[in-house]
């Protein structure tokens, strides 16, 4: 998945504190220990810190952990995962899509909603 670098946020930001964020995935990919991402099919385990090097190409980022700054709308067919971008992480922000891409992320838990407990 490609992240477009916003004109107002051209440089990476270093997180001065843990940042709350959310990922979205399909309901059938979630299990008690983790989940599988929608686009890259990456297997995440809950409460584990994942690290990568950001892949930057001109005005886009081609490698990194994507997440949302606002909790997305959930349905019967998807689940929302609460995550943290840990303090000290390098990240970019795009306000048009309320989206982050970071070099570190910690998936914490599935967020409960009216469709599942």
Predicted regions and their residues:
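ADP-ribose/NAD+-binding catalytic cleft of ART/PARP-like enzymes
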Residues: 1-66, 77-92
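Solvent-exposed, well-ordered amphipathic alpha-helical segments
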Residues: 22, 27, 109-117
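Short amphipathic alpha-helices within nucleic acid-binding modules
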Residues: 71-77
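Charge-dense polyanion-binding interfaces
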Residues: 78-115
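Residue-level signal for functionally critical sites in structured catalytic/ligand-binding pockets
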Residues: 61-69, 102, 107
């Amino acid at each position: 998945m490609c992240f477009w670098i916003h004109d107002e946020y051209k440089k990476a930001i270093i997180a001065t504190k843990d940042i709350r964020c959310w990922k979205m995935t399909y309901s059938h990919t979630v299990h008690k220990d983790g989940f599988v991402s929608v686009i890259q099919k990456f297997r995440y385990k809950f409460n584990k810190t994942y690290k990568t090097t950001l892949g930057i190409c001109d005005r886009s980022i081609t490698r990194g952990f994507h997440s949302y700054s606002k909790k997305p709308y959930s349905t019967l067919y998807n689940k929302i995962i609460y995550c943290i971008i840990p303090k000290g992480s390098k990240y970019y922000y795009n306000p048009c899509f309320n989206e982050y891409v970071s070099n570190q992320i910690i998936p914490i838990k599935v967020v409960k909603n009216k469709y599942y407990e």
